[in-house]
Design a protein with these regions (language model features):
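Extracytoplasmic copper-binding redox domains, predominantly the cupredoxin/blue-copper superfamily
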Residues: 2-19, 23-139
Length: 139
């Protein structure tokens, strides 16, 4: 009888341990899937050279992802030192400029916005063609 009780207790420990491991893995998976999801996806297009949508409104703490779905290089920046026209880019007071660098076809860039205000950005490659956009971040 004691052997049967020990066997049952051992099986119970194994099952409980397995369920705890599954629960931890599930919590990690849920946390990653929530963190990885952008609030908005902006598509970078070739013809005409443009962002879609051109203007978007999000909440502070949200993430925006720019995806190069075209066949050309694209670039997303709010950095005045990268822009041809300084008026094409801006960040609100207290926010740092961001710059994706060159994005090849199929690549993407994400930015999480914590400072409320208006962010004006451009594609440094196609700025002369008017490829500009705006993210409005609300509190």
């Amino acid at each position: 009888m004691q052997a049967l009780a020990r066997s049952y207790a051992h099986r119970l420990k194994v099952v409980v341990s397995f369920l705890m491991i599954v629960a931890v893995l599930l919590m990690i998976w849920i946390a990653r899937s929530k963190a990885a999801k952008p609030a908005v996806v902006i598509t970078m297009m070739d013809m005409p050279a443009s962002f879609a949508p051109m203007r978007t409104t999000i909440q502070a703490g949200d993430t925006v992802e720019w995806r190069n779905t075209g066949n050309q290089l694209h670039h997303v920046t709010t950095d005045p030192s990268t822009a041809l026209k300084k008026n094409d880019v801006s960040t609100p007071p207290g926010a740092k400029p961001f710059d994706s660098g060159f994005l090849k076809p199929g690549e993407s860039f994400s930015e999480t916005f914590s400072v409320p205000g208006v962010y004006r950005y451009t594609c440094a490659v196609h700025e002369a063609k008017g490829m500009n956009g705006e993210v409005i971040v609300q509190k």
